[in-house]
Amino acid sequence: MKKVFISGGGTGGHFYPALSVAENLKEKGFSITYIGTTNGIENKKDFPADEKILYPMRAVRGKSIVGKIQGVFSLLSTTFKVYKQIKKEKPDFSICFGGYTSIPLGLASFLARVPLYIHEQNSIPSYSNKILSYFAKKVFITFELTAKYFDRKKTVLTGMPLRKNIIERAKNYVYKPNQTKTVLVVGGSQGAKKLSESIISLASEMKDIKFILIKGKWQVEVPNLENLTVYEYVDNMEDLYTSADVVISRSGSSSVNEILCFGKYAIFVPFPYAASNHQYYNVKWLKDLGLCELIEEKDLSKEVLKKALEDAFNKDLESLSKKIKEYAIFDSDEKIVENILNDFKND
């Protein structure tokens, strides 16, 4: 049986694209070994792998000197453990989806001379993917502008692998304006307290608009308003996307690409502490095309959001939806898998 090693975890931004590609490979008859960390989302979520191996890894970025040393040591020691596993199982290739948890599999694959492929989710690549790109056979990118950070001969624009239920619902979805204006607010996995508080305040003023707020982990005081529905987290995002006229969201890669797939006009508020400010650049290109609004956290207020919403509802959202959807890539997982399998056909 054909075998592949996959790594991508720590957070959902790395985990879910890896899961999407793994499901595709399973359908094609591959045996999958997943490499992750005991400290990440992968320790709580199922993954379509025949074997799931989790190691106690530590991050390096943003830590103290002692923390960095501990992080480097944990990644190097894990690299040698993964190397032994690779020599034992002899995979045909490995795929890494970024984040510090990918470094051991990437380095071990290089040392064991196993073909390595990586996928970069964000506009500005992570340090781990920058390092691993030197050893990779191909670098799959989500945004066209990311190619300049890698060897262009290696880069392939594939888009962002998304969950099946999102893709299946979005493919044939056509936006039609709601009778009652509806705004979906997505705080992202880390939440957005300031954004949530601004929306709650705004909902009490703009009573002709229905607000659906996914607030994340933050504790905020929620008044009893008929036009405001609040969730901490939801699994059925596809239902909420289809019910909205406008989306207000953080701009992590998964959220951005889901919004593109549903063709939603969005007001993006990038998470200001994202590495290299990548959330800002994930949507700057879309703003330059006039297909979204972009508000930096430092400029965020109830008044600014109110003005942005009023401007949004004065636009031809139906026409904009068609233009936005043109930038969606619905078969990202298949593009990645096809590119890899074609390499083996041509070798």
Swiss-Prot record:
InterPro entries: GlcNAc_MurG, Glyco_trans_28_C, GlycoTrans_28_N. Pathway: Cell wall biogenesis; peptidoglycan biosynthesis. It holds the Pfam family Glyco_transf_28. It is a peripheral membrane protein. It comes from the Bacteria. GO terms for molecular function: UDP-N-acetyl-D-glucosamine:N-acetylmuramoyl-L-alanyl-D-glutamyl-meso-2,6-diaminopimelyl-D-alanyl-D-alanine-diphosphoundecaprenol 4-beta-N-acetylglucosaminlytransferase activity; undecaprenyldiphospho-muramoylpentapeptide beta-N-acetylglucosaminyltransferase activity. The keyword Transferase applies. GO terms for biological process: carbohydrate metabolic process; cell division; cell wall organization; lipid glycosylation; peptidoglycan biosynthetic process; regulation of cell shape. Keywords: Cell cycle, Cell division, Cell inner membrane, Cell membrane, Cell shape, Cell wall biogenesis/degradation, Glycosyltransferase, Membrane, Peptidoglycan synthesis, Transferase. UDP-N-acetyl-alpha-D-glucosamine binds at residues 11-13, 122, 163, 189, 279. It is found in: Cell inner membrane. It catalyses: di-trans,octa-cis-undecaprenyl diphospho-N-acetyl-alpha-D-muramoyl-L-alanyl-D-glutamyl-meso-2,6-diaminopimeloyl-D-alanyl-D-alanine + UDP-N-acetyl-alpha-D-glucosamine = di-trans,octa-cis-undecaprenyl diphospho-[N-acetyl-alpha-D-glucosaminyl-(1->4)]-N-acetyl-alpha-D-muramoyl-L-alanyl-D-glutamyl-meso-2,6-diaminopimeloyl-D-alanyl-D-alanine + UDP + H(+). GO terms for cellular component: plasma membrane. It is an enzyme of class 2 (transferase). Gene3D superfamilies: Glycogen Phosphorylase B. Its EC number is 2.4.1.227. The keyword Transferase applies. Cell wall formation. Catalyzes the transfer of a GlcNAc subunit on undecaprenyl-pyrophosphoryl-MurNAc-pentapeptide (lipid intermediate I) to form undecaprenyl-pyrophosphoryl-MurNAc-(pentapeptide)GlcNAc (lipid intermediate II). Belongs to the glycosyltransferase 28 family. MurG subfamily. This is UDP-N-acetylglucosamine--N-acetylmuramyl-(pentapeptide) pyrophosphoryl-undecaprenol N-acetylglucosamine transferase. It comes from Sulfurihydrogenibium sp. (strain YO3AOP1).
